[in-house]
Amino acid sequence: MGVLNISDQPPLVQAIFNRNADEVKLFLHKKDEVNALDQERRTPLHAAAWLGDVHIMDLLISAGANVNAKDHVWLTPLHRAAASRNERAVGLLLRKGADVTARDKYWQTPLHIAAANRATRCVETLLPHVSSLNMADRTGRAPLHHAAQSGYQEMVKLLLNKGANLSASDKKDRQPIHWAAYLGHLEVVKLLVSQGSDKSCKDKRGYTPLHAAAASGHVDVVKYLLRNGAEIDEPNAFGNTALHVACYTGQEAVANELVNRGANVNQPNHRGYTPLHLAAVSTNGALCLELLVNNGADVNMQSKEGKSPLHMAAIHGRFTRSQILIQNGGEIDCVDRYGNTPLHVAAKYGHELLISTLMTNGADTARQGIHGMFPLHLAVLYGSSDCCRKLLSSGQLYSIVLSMSKEHVLSAGFDINTPDNFGRTCLHAAASGGNIECLNLLLSSGADMNKKDKFGRTPLHYAAANGRYQCVVVLVGAGAEVNERDRSGCTPLHYSAASTAFCRTDRPHASTHQNQEDGEKESFLCVEHLLDNGADPCLCNTKGYSAVHYAAAHGNKQNLELLLEMCFNTLGDKESNGSISPLHLAVESGHWECVTVLIESGVCVDVCDPVGRSVLYLASQRGHSRCVELLLSQSASCLLAEHRSKWGPLHVAAANGHSECLRMLLCSEGGADLVNVTDAEGQTPLMLAVLGGHTDCVHLLLERGACPDMKDRRGRTALHRGAVMGREDCLTALLSHNVSVLSRDFQGRSALHLAASCGHADILSNLLSAADHSQPQDPLTDRHGYTPAHWAAYHGHEDCLEVLLELKPCSIQEGNPFTPLHCALINGHSGSAELLLESSVCNSLVNIRDAKGRTPLHAAAVAEDVAGLQLVLRQGADIDAVDHSGRSALMVAADYGQSGAVALLLHRAKADLSLLDVNKNTALHLACSKAHEMCAMLILKEIHNPILINATNSMLQMPLHIAARNGLATVVQALLNRGATVLAVDEEGHTPALACASNKAVADCLALILSTMKPSSSTASSSSPSSPSLNLLKHCGITAACPPLPNGGLRHGYGKDRHGATIGLDGCLTE
């Protein structure tokens, strides 16, 4: 209970704490509030239960005290009594109806409280009333967990005897033995193990009881677990053994026990760290490190990042440990994966004493590490002047020269001006780091301040970019050129103007607001100092940007003001040279304060960039409403449009859904007159808002007078766009403003056509309802006679077809005779076809013909939609119906090479193979003419009439001629086996053999050669006029190619229908 002054409590509570039952009776007789609450919502009964005064408790309960009252942390009087270990109070409360399952805010029941507080008798009193001994609190711990944590052996024994689950796990999978081991309760651990607890059980992170005991340094528990068979080198989920854990936590006694028991001192974890690595880095791991080294630990073993124990010691400056490692063979110049030695690491983290030790032991100060940097680079970059001084005093290049011969006999160290991989010297690093003492040390040691990196930047560029004012002052004072340009043409002033964008962010202080303000102040001082020392604010880089541009782009208001003061009247010249203006750059990133500064300096607010985008356009596009407001207050024009698409500010605001910017534009002077302004394609802001689905912008434009029926250059309105994109909310807004639902585009399509084509059923339903109110007699056809039903069927949108069948059933039979059923089947949408055939308005369409005489069965044959073919055949389709070119569905399938359709029509429907088209082609002719070998073979297997084998078409060609010409060897063999004649000639006088020739001229030549090879005989001399040689001589002078198989236009009939204007429904609205 909270500590309160008893004298401040009500008289009843004071009487309870004085244990004066008579006074309690008196106050209760005076009707004092028995359930009064203190500031922590505790009742008098809570106080009595905590005291354990059963008589007073009984008086309070008899007077109406609530036995289950909860205080501010949900503790009941029963919780209080259990915590006080008063079994009589617990018993009384239970008899008076106290809830034994009541939970506090941590979900702990009175049993949890009693187990945690060693209240054995209270637990014995509670046990007959609880249904489960293993109920978990908020952390998942059962009463046995709390008992094990308390270390009270009798409580643990009681709960186990009553059936508590020995292996109960909390939310981190920790069992009671984990907690007992971690807290060093050896007797409890022994008891749990004797009862069968798993001494090697693991929690969610793989920690065993041995890990837990090792972490907290309980060597007696460690010894007991090891004696009872605990695996000494068992790793956890991170690969750490108990020895890793002991070394990391500095538990030398445990580490000693583990090593003596044979623990592997060189076992790496998942990151490659051994116990020695962790001992080297640990706060209290010095003794552990010495122990490991003395017991054979590998002092040069490297982690997966290449770090040795000496690297780890260097990170935290463990001076003594580094000496031990070096004395025991630790490699001084061992490099990690980044090329850094321990000296690099010590220099980075500023451990001057450790640097001395490493250098004394021969560390190479000239070894290049990450990005080719010396240790000195890192020392000055991270601002350690002591380390810098130490490295300079011992590491600079020096030579010993013989006095007589002038011969160099010894040289060591490094050249202070040696660049890293990016051309940066130590002076560049010092200028970037900002430590003025390091900078002065380098300059006094001969560092070249005019040295440039690979990007042409001097140390002054780096100091300016990082806002290092003192470094800038020193470098400028030392003679650094303030107008020196780098390879991109930028001077130090450019970088200083935008220094907050280039400052390093890996320092812990860089994120605080105070340091951000300090950085902005230093940046301003850098700009001021550079300007005072001759920096030219009008110099532009290779892209035409000056320091003013940089300050504006990065929102540095103070720098911008200072630079503008120094630019005088040159800013207007910069704006007019065709490059992007500072105002554009400020607006693009939404730096409204910089926009204000630029406007006050007199810049033109209607300046445009090279592609014609005005500043207002850019602000509207990005949605920077403060900038838009500022520009409009200066009368920025809303009429200026960019060059390519002619979009203006209203277009981009609407297209990007920036409703606040759009509202400002519409409310500006003259803005209301631009509500219907069009771009190069004739699009209005309303169309673009609908296209993007920006409902708030749509409502705003409509309220401001936008015309919903305006059309673009292709005749499409905002409604067309909403129908294509499925913008239901936008369409609702348009419909509420009486938009013309049936407005047609240049192809005669309305929004209904497009909604049906794109499958937006809900939108189609709404549009149909609106159209029915406005123009109920409209046939809903486009220029080619197609209705929304055609489009829905063509794309297989069954939900749209259902809407049309329900709301506009008559439209199914209207329009182009190439019906919706044809459209569904030709694209293989059998589900849509079935839906149409099942409807009452379409049940007579199964044999309907289009303008070319084609039935739905023809369409299904083209698509090889087996399901569609079966569907129309079940509905009574005429299998042998022919179109105007004389072709049946089988002939169409053979012509298109749809072998599945051919097989179905032949085997199941028994299609007539003797049918001829207008050019006397059979199905076999058509299959061979397109080289559809599989179809030809299927047809051949079903031909039982030999006449069909040698049937000729209008050009006297047999299937053998055509198959031979197309190189169908399998079909030719089958035809020959079926008795196809090899001497029959076509109208060109060619036999099937000559038909194999690539063209007519080749065939003629082949015939001449064959004729000369024949032996002379009376039979040959008296050959009939129709013999091949005579016919060939008749045409031997003709060299034109043999004409193709006549098809009366049918060959391309369906192709045109699928891709042309008659059948092939072209794509819907594309933007």
UniProtKB/Swiss-Prot annotation:
Transmembrane feature ranges: none
Superkingdom: Eukaryota
Entry keywords, A to Z: ANK repeat, Repeat
Signal peptide: none
Cited InterPro entries: Ankyrin_rpt, Ankyrin_rpt-contain_sf
ANK repeats, residue ranges: 7-36, 40-69, 73-102, 106-135, 139-168, 172-201, 205-234, 238-267, 271-301, 305-334, 338-367, 371-400, 422-451, 455-484, 488-539, 543-573, 578-607, 611-640, 645-674, 681-710, 714-743, 747-776, 784-814, 816-845, 852-881, 885-915, 919-951, 955-984
A Pfam short name: Ank
Function: Putative regulatory subunit of protein phosphatase 6 (PP6) that may be involved in the recognition of phosphoprotein substrates.
Oligomer and partners: Protein phosphatase 6 (PP6) holoenzyme is proposed to be a heterotrimeric complex formed by the catalytic subunit, a SAPS domain-containing subunit (PP6R) and an ankyrin repeat-domain containing regulatory subunit (ARS).
Protein name (Swiss-Prot/TrEMBL): Serine/threonine-protein phosphatase 6 regulatory ankyrin repeat subunit C
Species this protein is from: Danio rerio (Zebrafish)
